[in-house]
């Protein structure tokens, strides 16, 4: 049998490293959380962790943006935010993205008699705001060099953000920390087509990156 391999990403600087550096008595870190919350449940746990940190006064969730399209993705995020007592967190959805199926998002439609089991106001993703304008508005209203953007999915929101008019200057002024869980930034098997390169090469703020190692097994 030919050797197979896994790519294992080892996070030298975690997506939550901005909060990890929090000092007692400091102001909560303003967070914009960008997620591909559709297929895997890990992003649900990551958002739940952010809410727990917000409960402890370590961060403030300014907004959540979604980088994959599913009719129920924004509804699920709204239900999760509501469950943790923050129903008014703005939610943005990326534009012109392919639709993705999900095995768990349908939970948001479950009802107990005539009410949603998990209360929420956003009933379909199309009701949510557009991701890039939302991020820019949140940054405009933030203090200088205060915001941490945490991307734990595709770069389908951050890449167009960097290309938006005035976005580079806005990011440089408002963002203190950009933490990206992304893919490869260099040529792999002759393939150079990676959206993450836009974030690495053209982002004017601190960007923790994860290293990738290849492990072989038989």
Mark where each language-model region is.
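Positively charged n-region of N-terminal signal peptides that target proteins for export
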Residues: 1-5
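Bacterial N-terminal signal peptides
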Residues: 7-15
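N-terminal acidic, glycine/proline-rich low-complexity segments
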Residues: 18-218
């Amino acid at each position: 049998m030919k050797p197979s391999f896994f790519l294992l990403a080892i996070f030298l600087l975690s997506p939550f490293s901005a909060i990890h550096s929090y000092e007692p008595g400091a102001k909560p870190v303003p967070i914009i959380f960008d997620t591909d919350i559709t297929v895997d449940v890990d992003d649900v746990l990551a958002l739940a962790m952010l809410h727990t940190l917000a409960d402890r006064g370590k961060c403030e969730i300014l907004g959540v943006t979604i980088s994959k399209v599913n009719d129920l993705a924004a509804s699920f995020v709204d239900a999760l935010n509501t469950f943790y007592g923050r129903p008014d967190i703005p939610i943005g959805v990326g534009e012109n993205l392919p639709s993705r199926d999900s095995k768990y998002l349908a939970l948001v439609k479950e009802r107990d008699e005539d009410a949603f089991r998990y209360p929420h106001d956003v009933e379909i993703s199309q009701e949510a705001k557009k991701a890039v304008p939302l991020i820019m508005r949140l940054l405009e209203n933030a203090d200088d060099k205060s915001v941490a953007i945490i991307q734990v999915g595709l770069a389908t929101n951050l890449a167009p953000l960097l290309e938006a008019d005035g976005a580079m200057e806005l990011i440089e002024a408002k963002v203190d920390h950009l933490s990206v869980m992304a893919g490869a930034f260099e040529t792999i098997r002759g393939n150079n087509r990676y959206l993450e390169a836009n974030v690495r090469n053209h982002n004017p703020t601190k960007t923790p990156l994860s290293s990738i190692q290849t492990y072989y097994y038989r």
